[in-house]
Amino acid sequence: EPIRFPYHYRAPVNTGVDSGIDLDGDGKTGGPGDSWGFGRFPGQYGMLVLSRFPLADEKSRTFQNFRWSDMPDARRPTNPDGSPFHPDEVWNQLRLSSKSHWDVVFDIDGKDFHLLAHHPTPPVFDGPEDRNGARNFDEIRFWRDYTFPRPMEYMTDDRGVSGGLPADARFVIAGDFNADPHDGDSAAGAIDQLLDAPWIDASCTPLSEGGAEAAVKQGGVNARHAGDPAADTSDFNDRQVGNLRLDYLLPASSLDVIGCGVYWPAEDQPGNASIGFSDHRLVWLDIRL
């Protein structure tokens, strides 16, 4: 019997939405780097949530328009000489989310369950100011602050409602975070903001035989990586980037985790032929509610 997903959630994202200002510092406007999130058309690299359970749409929240400068102690990108990369009039308009941050609420047996979905920008494709690395770091930090057990009020959603999750909320943070705990180009400690948070359970590290096998067979940069290749969730150019752990399902520490893994079959295992449709791999997590 297949698993059926009769419900879905979608909302606008920032990729490809023209800002009308010069965001990438090339002296021009209207390019893909001048969109609120890099993209050549609105919705490129967008997100979709499929669900077996009904949604509580009236309780769900989006933070597409949240301004980066409204985050306390934001990592404002700076030039090598210490000056701000973005002029104040640009910085004060910048949106934090390269796509969006969604708090999607489901009704499971009459109780709320929160899926916190996002897709932070890759921490590359910039210059010495590291504007994408800084944005990636703070996009990840947003969920740390949002789930912090003592309420933080700075985050305001697209309906104008402020504040984060209640301390007893049931949640899982999900997405392509574009940050590996050991390798790659993300800012130091970016993903550790969540992996080390005591109210988040990161104890179940998803693994696969295919990831370990691919790192050995593909070689290249993979041979110099510090992380366990069995935990990799992406398969990239082995001359420059290599395979990385970028995709996560991070549950609240109050939830009962019973298993997790990465769907990356080894070459001699059933299903291996199905993984070529993407350079990312499916991550799964079983929890008992």
At which residue positions do the language-model features occur?
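Active-site catalytic loop in hydrolytic enzyme cores
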Residues: 63-107
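Loop/turn elements at helix/coil->beta-strand transitions in domains of secreted/extracellular proteins
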Residues: 2-7, 109-114, 167-170, 255
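Active-site surface patch of divalent metal-dependent phosphodiester/phosphate bond hydrolases
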Residues: 1-81
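Active-site His/acidic residue clusters
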Residues: 111-134
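Metal-dependent phosphoester-hydrolase catalytic domains
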Residues: 50-72, 105-106, 132-173, 177-289
